[in-house]
Regions:
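Helicase-primase coupling helices
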Residues: 1-151
Length: 151
């Protein structure tokens, strides 16, 4: 399974999509080319005819930090490519965790609306959904291993 396939299937499974239209377009184009044997996403998007996508690609690919020569000489460096099998699932969970956290914030804001307090059915429904998402958030936090969910 390629990274593109994994990301597309993982997002479809949870009925998620990127909010940013550029990210959606890039994923859509990557999906269209994912079975092309000579398709290399990095090259494709860097040379994209749309300069905005090309610039975004540069920003996404650019390595922000470099390991000092002292450390790189004394130890074997494990590259991102070698760690894809562990990084991609973890990054997808991070992405979903951020979505769930944002949704919970919006729900809390909605629950503060006095008009909602007047409608018991809507309020109960929103509270039930809030509790479900809180449970999902807690499970995701445990899988990520380094998150503390405050109640």
């Amino acid at each position: 399974v390629t990274v593109i396939e994994y990301v597309i299937n993982d997002l479809k499974e949870d009925e998620l999509a990127f909010h940013n239209p550029l990210h959606r377009q890039m994923l859509s184009e990557a999906a269209a080319h994912m079975y092309d044997s000579n398709f290399i996403a990095e090259r494709y998007f860097l040379a994209h005819p749309d300069p905005v996508i090309s610039k975004l690609s540069v920003d996404l690919i650019n390595v922000r930090y470099q390991l000092s020569k002292y450390h790189s000489k004394s130890q074997k460096i494990v590259t991102d490519e070698e760690r894809l099998y562990e990084m991609v699932p973890m990054l997808m969970i991070n992405f979903k965790y951020a979505i769930v956290t944002e949704e919970l914030k919006h729900m809390l804001y909605a629950l503060q609306d006095p008009a909602l307090a007047q409608d018991n059915e809507k309020c109960d429904s929103l509270m039930k959904r809030f509790n479900e998402l809180k449970t999902v958030q807690s499970i995701m936090a445990k899988r990520l291993g380094d998150r503390v969910v405050l109640r």
